[in-house]
Each structure stands twice: as structure tokens, then as C-alpha cells.
Amino acid sequence: MLFTAASYARMSVHYPVAGSSYTYVRKALDSRLGFIVGWTILLDYLFLPLVIWLIGAAYLTGEFPSVPSWVWIVLFIVTTTALNIVGLKVADKANFVLMAMQFLVLALFVLFAVVYMVSNHGGGSLLSANPFTGEGGFSAIASGAAIAAYSFLGFDAVSTLTEDTKDPQRNIPRAIMLVALVGGVVFVTVAYALTLVEPGSTFDNADSLAADTARTIGGSLFAAFFVGGLIIGQFTSGLAAQASVSRLQFAMGRDGVLPKGFFGRLSDRFATPIFNIVLCGLIGLGALFLDVATSTSFINFGAFTAFTLVNLSVIGYFMRHRDTAAGSGLNPATYVVVPLIGALVDVYLLTKLDSAALMLGASWLAIGVVYLLVLTRGLRVPPPEMSLVEDDTTGFRQGPARSQE
């Protein structure tokens, strides 16, 4: 992830505009490849609320086993869909408080895990190579990494804040790397602590393992606090994710990327894209038939595809500008070797996703290619622009009109 984060950081210097992977690939490689990246990003957005609702339902099912999982899933979907239709937004200060609460929950989890291990197995048990080696060898670790990469996603979204940031060519690259590093440290620390307590590879309910472990190390009271904190975070995240994808669909409908009659309409009463919100809720019902690992893999397919092309866009930028004045200071090690490693790792992890994710992802890409051919009249005209950043009225900030972003 750090190799890929470095590529995002590098491209944000050369293209200090909002748009992230879509913009980088379009400008450095090709507008049609940029469209494909935007298409895969749409898959991520469509499945993100589903994954969030599914994880929340898994925690609640573990806490209340007598209540079927589908009840929690439907409750999440109906509640967030209704709130998004009326246009409820969570204030920035509330988001900050919720984020701080989740950090507190994770910090307490690690603390209780350390106390548990020392009390039951001695201080020496805190140092173990098992969390990094596992029982199934490198192949099993790689397969797990292909799913765990979901926990590192987010650094790529920093570049969408470019136009709102002071001195973006200096601060955005630093922020991208910092988010990747901090997210990585938090994930590795919590995962290490959890694996010390639960070193096995077979569990009664893998989806609620963290909550079950919280009960083991801290008792029922801490488990309730742990689940409560995570559920609040899951609920607000699901609310934001559903709002984001519905507004993304609206922007794409408004710009002619998707059928305007359905996707490009706002409610006269609430000024929200009701059809898109309901569609997202209906897609979320797929959580009734999926587990966390499989649904997360769907998101990672789109992420790994975009990551690979962003890494290649760095190499493309180097090849295009190496003989120009702008490319006089470009270092082949940082513009070829580093992104090439990132691309190879991303492709390798992509191949480690489960077959269902690969099949869905390949089908989605095939649909995107066919749709691109239709929109461009057989590649004879440029693909339409995708608006992937927020504004104050529709949730997406509009830039100058262009054939592509």
C-alpha cells in the first residue's frame, strides 16, 4: 500500500486538481482508461454501503444471537435510506467526536489484550512471530492481505481535497503518505493484538471475531462498549457512504455518463436523488446473501484495478515527460521502480481475491467496456466527463466543463 500511496502522492504534485485516480489515469495515460477507472470506482461506491451494513449486522448478531442477521441488515438499510432521502447530514464536529470514540475503543482493545496476555501467558507472550507467519504459509497470508487491504483504503481519497487545501503540492502528498502510514500502524497494531489472543485460523463466527475477542479480554461490559462504539461508527459511515454513491450517480447522470432521466433527477421536496438512494438500498439487500470477506473482495477488486493504473500512470508520466524541461528532475527509481513494484503487488493481490469477486469484477469491467464503446460511438469521440468530487448543492463540486475530467 505504501508503494501505491507514493504513486498517488507523486501524481498529486503534477496534477494538483481534485479527481484522484480518475484524473491521474486520464491525464497521464488515456481518457478511455480514465473512464474505466471511474467505472471501477463506481463499483466500489456501490458495494461500500453494503459492506458497512453487513459488518454492523455481524457485530449485532454476535451480541444478540437470537435476532437473525437479516433483521439488522434490513433495519440499517431502511433507516439510512430514509434519513438520506430527507437529506440528513452528520456535522463535522460530530464526525470528529465519533472518530475519536472509535480510536478510544481500539486503544482500549489493545490495552485489554496486552493485560490479558500478560496475566494468562506471561510477558514473553507479547512477542510472537505467529501473527506475521500464520499457519497456512505465504499463500494464505497473501489471500488474507487481499481482503485486509480494505482496511487501508482511504489514503487515495485525500487527493480529492486538493482544491480545498492550502499549498496542495506540498501538503497533499504528505497527507496521503501520513494517512497510509497511520492507518497501517493502527491496523497492524490491532490485528497483532487480536491474533495474540486468538491465534487460530478457524473460528465459530469470523465476521464477529473482534467483538467475541473483546468479550474474552474485557468481559461483557467492555464487549458492549466495544460493539456500541463500532455500531455508531458503522451507522454514520453507512449514512455517508450511501449519500456519496447516490450523489455520484446523480453527478454521472447529470453529465450524461449514466441515463439522465433516472440518475440525474433530484426530489422537488428534499433536493436529494431519491431514485439513486433507493437503488443503493436495494443493492444493499445483497448483504443478505454474502459474508464480510466476499463482499469486501468486491470493493478490493475496484481498488486494486484503480491502484494498478495509478501506478502505471506514474510510469506513463515519466515516459511522456522525461525528455522535456518538466521531466529533467524525474528520478527513474521513484518514477519507474517504485510504481512498478506497487503495480505488481496490486495485480498479485487482485489474483488472490476469491472467485466470486473476480467473476463480478470481470463482468463489471466488461459492461464498462461495452458502455464505453456505446458512449464514444466505437471510440470515435472522447468519453464524457465524470464528476467525482463534491459541491455544495448536489454533493459534488463542479469544475470547468471538459470532455473528460
What are these model-derived regions, one by one?
Residues M1-I85, V90, I231-A251, D291-L309:
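Hydrophobic transmembrane alpha-helices that form the core helical bundles
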Residues S69-G122, I176-L181, I299-L309, T334, ...:
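Membrane-interface loop-to-helix entry segments
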Residues A94, G261-A271, F307-A357, V381, ...:
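C-terminal membrane-solvent junction of multi-pass transporters and transport-like membrane proteins
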Residues Y59, T81-I85, V110, A191-Y192, ...:
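Alpha-helical transmembrane segments of multipass membrane proteins
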Residues P68, V97-V227:
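Helix-loop-helix junctions that connect adjacent transmembrane segments
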Residues R26, I52-I73, V105, T162-Q169, ...:
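Helix-loop-helix connectors at the membrane interface of multi-pass transporters/channels
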Residues T23, D30, G62, A175-A241, ...:
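TM-loop-TM module centered on a large, flexible mid-protein loop between adjacent transmembrane helices
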Residues G302-A303, A333-E405:
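A generic transmembrane alpha-helix motif of multi-pass inner-membrane proteins
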